[in-house]
Amino acid sequence: MAEQVFQNFETLQLHAGYTPDPHTRSTAVPIYATSSYTFNDSAHGARLFGLKELGNIYSRLMNPTVDVFEKRIAALEGGIAAAATSSGQAAQFLTIATLAKAGDNIVASSHLYGGTYNQLNVLLPRFGIKTKFVRSGKLEDYAAAIDDQTRAIYVESMSNPDYVVPDFEGIAKIAHEHGIPLVVDNTLGAGGYYIRPIEHGADIVVHSATKWIGGHGTTIGGVIVDSGRFNWNKHSDRFPEMVEPSPSYHGLKYWEAFGPATFITRIRVEMLRDIGACLSPFSAQQLLLGIETLGLRAERHAQNTEKLSKYFESSPNVSWVLWPGSESHPTYSQAKKYLTRGFGAMLSIGVKGDASAGSKVVDGLKLVSNLANVGDAKSLAIHPWSTTHEQLSEDERLASGVTEDMIRISVGIEHVDDIIADFEQSFQKAYGS
């Protein structure tokens, strides 16, 4: 495909990264169900293992089906390359483990998905990597948190579940002034449809591909995208592993050999090699099928979410509505600036009543599913206080934007009138009105 000619999202989601293979001319991406690949000869194998030549060695490192998925996501996000992982949590862990080591820290917004907060706050400190959480969105607070051991700033493009949209350009400027990359979890950005963080200064983008990218609740997967814009050589004092001789490859210097692709190369040839959190070709094929309709789904998701938000704003059973497209949202001005193709596919509401009211409303839904996922074509709802953020302390939950009365809703592509009717009947059961 001549990707330099065809650059529109809806075209890239169907064609980027794949040309029919010369053997079968298959128009669909084949599933390469193989663990390993035959070398031309021993010398060829030696060149591959020594990174003197790029090619397939073992499917833990790369696989032709997975390769198409990686190239397609990189194209959609505007990066130079991508590496697929077994899950979004794996993508996040491998990214941070590549940037930081024992004794280092990262600076992160406190407005995060519960699993992310737990990984940063509980798991990574066991490896000697600490996180400094910034509760406000103030740029000066991000700057104040950075010290000589800081290796990245980490934010979500729309935080889950309170949909805070950060000032990407302002935070990126601060990160770059201090010689560190900005890492953005763009899961809620739907594969780059609602926002492409790289265009606003992000250096690395991660996704849970399980969500809108796959789009049908069938497959667990993650992906890391490298913008190729961060100069690791310039900031070698913070990132010596990017430029100094690597003990893994007989003194190979990544920056010297791979330049702008240094970070994503280390992800592949060190992290995927040593940690093994790779994506299977079967999962890659499922995710590729999802990507083909991503733009169409994302458009309908956003339309339905806006209409559902207006319904909730007029409901006597709802105390408040959190939706980034609402003028009452704390970061509406930033959402309006950065989310140019719709305000996403999620919203949260606060229901009236005691602490059990949220659970009662969720339990009364018939069409909307009560489960721990987002980004499905079907509508989903959950009570975060007692589920996704339950492992956090009360103070940590509040810092993440989670309250007892909150219901988080991932709005699907059903007819919006039916989604509204389902909430209406559940409110009737819970409140009698």
Swiss-Prot record:
Record carries keyword RNA-binding: no
Name of the protein this chain belongs to: Sulfhydrylase FUB7
EC number(s) from the headed UniProt entry: 2.5.1.-
Requisite cofactors: pyridoxal 5'-phosphate
Keyword Oxidoreductase found: no
Applied relevance: Fusaric acid is phytotoxic to plants such as cotton and banana. It has been shown to induce programmed cell death in plants. In addition to a mild toxicity to animals, fusaric acid exhibits acanthamoebicidal, antioomycete, and antimycobacterial activities.
Signal peptide: none
CDD domains: CGS_like
Gene: FUB7
Pfam families found in the cross-reference section: Cys_Met_Meta_PP
Xref: PROSITE patterns: CYS_MET_METAB_PP
Source organism superkingdom: Eukaryota
Keywords: Pyridoxal phosphate, Transferase
Function statement: Sulfhydrylase; part of the gene cluster that mediates the biosynthesis of fusaric acid, a mycotoxin with low to moderate toxicity to animals and humans, but with high phytotoxic properties. L-aspartate is suggested as fusaric acid amino acid precursor that is activated and further processed to O-acetyl-L-homoserine by cluster enzymes aspartate kinase FUB3 and homoserine O-acetyltransferase FUB5, as well as enzymes of the primary metabolism.
Stored PANTHER family: HOMOCYSTEINE/CYSTEINE SYNTHASE (PTHR43797), HOMOCYSTEINE_CYSTEINE SYNTHASE (PTHR43797:SF2)
A GO biological process held by the record: L-homocysteine biosynthetic process
Modified residues (N6-(pyridoxal phosphate)lysine): K211
